[in-house]
Amino acid sequence: MKPIQRARLQTRCSRGFTLACDDDATIRVTALLPDLARITLLRGGEVRQKRSWSVPARGEFDTPWAGRARLDDSSWPAVSLELTATEAELNLATEAMRLTVRLDPLRMNWALSDGTTFASDREIQPYFLGQKTHAFRHAMARRPGDRYYGAGDKTGPLDLYGRRLRCAMRDSLGYDPQRGDPLYKNWPLLIVRDGPSGVSHGIFYDNGPEGCFDLGCEHDNYFGRYRYYEAEDGDLDFYLFVGPRLQDVTPKFLALTGRTALPPRWSLGFAQTAMGLADAPDAQAQIRGVIEKAREHEIPLSAFHFGSGYTSIGPKRYVFTWNFRKFPEPKALMRDFAEAGVKVVANVKPCLLDDHPQYRDVAARGAFIAGAAAEAPLKSQFWDGEGAHLDFTNPAAIRWWQEGLTNELLGYGVDAGWNDNNEYGLWDDEATSAGFGEPTPLSLLRPVQALLMTRATREAQLAAKPRERPFTVTRAGGPGIQRYAQTWSGDNTTGWDSLKWNLRTGLGMSLSGLYNIGHDIGGFAGPTPDPELLIRWTQAGVLHPRFLMNS
């Protein structure tokens, strides 16, 4: 990568200004609200990803299916601001914030309206752009006493200071609850409590490709104390908003990316699942026994989550199919749950194995992620076989998904879908999404695929039952999934350390704007918990919106 060293004023507008920089780069500096500034770096006047699915137009709950035009700021209200310029620097001041841009060498500084600095770029070379790749880096100063929070589902202490954390999605079964990274979310939001001033702010990088936050792990003597966000692809396009209190930052992030979907009341009650139940040869009888045991022991069971075993033949899973040997009468079983007042949530996966009965039909629709030969599905390893992932930036895939969910699950009496295994771990550089008519590397859109899968599930449920508040769950995704779904900390492991550290992960997720969350009570992987561990985990689970015992 190469640093951007110098800038000059190119144009002014009612919201801010544009800088002309080295190597045909430009930087747009705009004030969207008195306490919200946006910085967008363009190469050759263009952005790499022309649309955003994380930031709706101002006042809208959601983006269009094909995303919002990234550079369109027209929905934001007019902001009263003052622009001043000298040969050495530019100043943009609102009633809440003052942004100063030093032009040579390039550096930005953010302060309150009274002049109190709360955030600054690194003194030397804060902006880097890849010359042979689409990578970039943004480095900011670390100050004594800084505290860092957020970044999604991160393990370990709540304060992330001193760590290097990846913004990426992985199927992290059995992760280390104190040190494991990454988990399931790509969440490039950092909440900073500035040490010297005590002022808190958030900085959100609206970028989907994989990246990382270095929050003081790296040290280079020539550059002083610094932290940075870097990504292997995409756009350096960030929103910086001042609290100024710590508790003010998360609501402002949600005002930007969309508020939490209001869940139905039943989803807040106790739920039960176990992977082994749906995998058992007599699965229907065993699952019916859950209803009977709950009644016998007076356990107020609100929901049962079906593991993917209802679709299994041997170790393989076939989405939107039923294994009628294990479930000879699935509709009758759903009626039993309904009569007991228990809702049913069924596991669904975005990949079709190549021997799935509908694989050829879906391939003929062009609804899979494509490989080097654009017309051919890209195959990858998935659940003891090879398969292809659905491309939710293709309307054909969305239609097929919603038809399958409606006919094969909702039509059988299932109440909701549980979007699982949606990290889109395809590591072929030539993997390509349809991009709603603009073919796009999958590397730019992994979190978007999980987000749109979840949206497709939610909207199919709403169409089937328009008078009921929809509910769905997703394991993976990026900022915006809170508009549709509940989520959780994934496939944890039985042990006191998981109970301890998952609580901190949950607090970090909540600070990141993921409010409807929880953890697998008792641990998903590992041995059976001892009685005290299970009791303590259940007591903690009562205090979470997702109150689910899973193994």
Predicted segment positions?
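Aromatic- and carboxylate-enriched substrate-binding clefts and catalytic-loop regions
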Residues: F61, W65-R68, S302-S551
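A generic structural motif
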Residues: A274-A278, I521-G523
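Acidic (Asp/Glu)-rich catalytic clusters
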Residues: G258-A261, R295-E298, G506-L511
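N-terminal accessory segment at the very beginning of proteins
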Residues: M1-S267, A271-M275, D282-E292, F306, ...
